[in-house]
């Protein structure tokens, strides 16, 4: 897939239809974007905006993906462990009853680290 980091402001074919980016470059950019998010995310508990827990979950998922599928090495396991430890000291936790995660009266419970507000009447 082409990875575009700057806006395209012309009708030039090379800009409108860029070549495929190398897979390694795309994965590196994902890692850089996650590290940027870590630096800029503010602490808080509002689950409708990105929180440190949400970013650390993404960081752990990325690191485990790189380790398992891209031969990323032990550095990626350490990165995942670091992110999971950061989540472990937060208020996020697994609930004892799986069904309670989805209960209408239990929205945004302790297991939810990021949520979207689905307001069906909003236009």
Where are these regions (language model features)?
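Structured, solvent-exposed acidic/aromatic patches
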Residues: 1-123
């Amino acid at each position: 897939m082409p990875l575009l980091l700057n806006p395209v402001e012309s009708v030039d074919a090379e800009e409108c239809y860029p070549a495929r980016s190398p897979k390694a470059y795309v994965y590196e950019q994902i890692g850089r974007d996650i590290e940027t998010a870590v630096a800029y995310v503010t602490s808080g508990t509002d689950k409708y905006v990105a929180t440190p827990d949400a970013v650390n979950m993404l960081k752990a998922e990325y690191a485990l993906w790189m380790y398992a599928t891209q031969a990323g090495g032990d550095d990626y396991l350490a990165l995942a462990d670091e992110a999971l430890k950061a989540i472990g000291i937060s208020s996020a936790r697994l609930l004892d009853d799986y069904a309670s995660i989805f209960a209408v009266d239990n929205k945004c419970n302790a297991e939810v680290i990021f949520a979207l507000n689905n307001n069906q009447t909003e236009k």
